[in-house]
Amino acid sequence: MEFEIALAKEQSYLDIIPKKASEEIGRVLAELTISPEELRQGTLLNGVPILPLLELVKEKLSTESKTYLHFGATSQDAMDTAMVLMLREALGVINERLTTLEDNLSQLREKYGDTPCMARTRGQLAVPISFGDKIDAWLEPLKRHEKRLTTISKGALKIQLGGAAGNRAAYHEKGETLSDALASALKLSSGSSWHAQRDSLCELTNWLAIISSILGKMGADILVLAQSEINEVTENAEGGGKSSAMPHKNNPILSEALVALAKLNAGLQSQMLLCLIHTNERDATAWILEWSCVPQMLINTATSLGHAIAISKKVKVNTDNMRLNVERFKNQG
C-alpha cells in the first residue's frame, strides 16, 4: 500500500496521471480496511495478493480514478518493493543487535582476554593461547561483515519498477525519471528493474547466512568448552538448560541453537541460489522460493544474534579451569 500511494503521487508530479486521481487513490489506500479472508481467497485464485488488494481499492474509487490505480506497474513491482521495505526494517533490527553483540564481546575480551587457555586443533589439545584469541575468532568476522552490510544493503534495498516485462514501456521516456522519483520518495536505491536479476537479493541473504555461521562457530566452540570434563565456560552463570532426568545438568541450550540456526540458514541460502535461475523475464517458481526463504532467514539471523547477546551477558568464564588445563598440558612434557 505504501508503494501504491507513492507510485500514484510521483506519477501525478510527472503528469503521467491526473493529480485528482492521485489524491483519491492516496486517500482510499490510507483509509482502507483489508479483510484477511478476502485477501487469502484472492491470493489462492491468482497466486499473488496484489490483484485482490487492487480490487478492494477499486470498489471505493471513482470510475475515472480506477483507470490510474497501479498504472503501468505489475504485481511484482509492488511485491518486490514491499519486500525491500520490510527488509530494510528487519536489517535495522539485525544491525542494532550486531552492534550490541560486538560491544558485549569486546567487553568480555577486555575482562578475560589475557587469561591463558588451550588451543584445540582437529579436536586435540594444541598449544596455549589466550582466551582473547578465541574471542577474536568470533568478534573479528562480525566486525568485517558489519562493514560489508552497507555496500550489500545499497544493492539489495532497491526500488522495483519494471512494468509488464521489465522495460517500463508504459511510461515511455519518463520511466527512468519515475523510478528515480519513486526510489527517492521511499528512500531506496534506484536503477534498472530487477524482475529476473536476483543477485543483489541473494548476496544479502548470503550475508545473513554468513552472520549465522559465524555465530554457529561461536556456539560450537562454547559447546566444547562447556563440556563437563573441560568446564572452561558455563553458558549461563544464572542457571538454566535443566534436564528432566538429570537435575545436575546446565545444558548450553543457546549455543546448541546457534549451531542449529546456522545450519538452517546455510540450507536456505542454497535455495536462494536457485532463485538466480530466473527463467526469461519473470519466473514465479523462483519467486515463491524467495517468499519462503527470505523471511525465515531474517528470523533465524535475528534470533541467533539475540541468543548470542544473551550468552555474552550471562556467560561464566572459568579462568581457574583454563589455567589448570594449560598447566596439565605443560606438565605432560
Predicted feature locations:
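Conserved helix-loop functional segments at active or binding sites
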Residues: 111-114, 148-151, 155, 184, ...
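Acidic, glycine-rich loop-and-beta core segments that form the ion-binding/anion-interacting portion
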Residues: 177-266
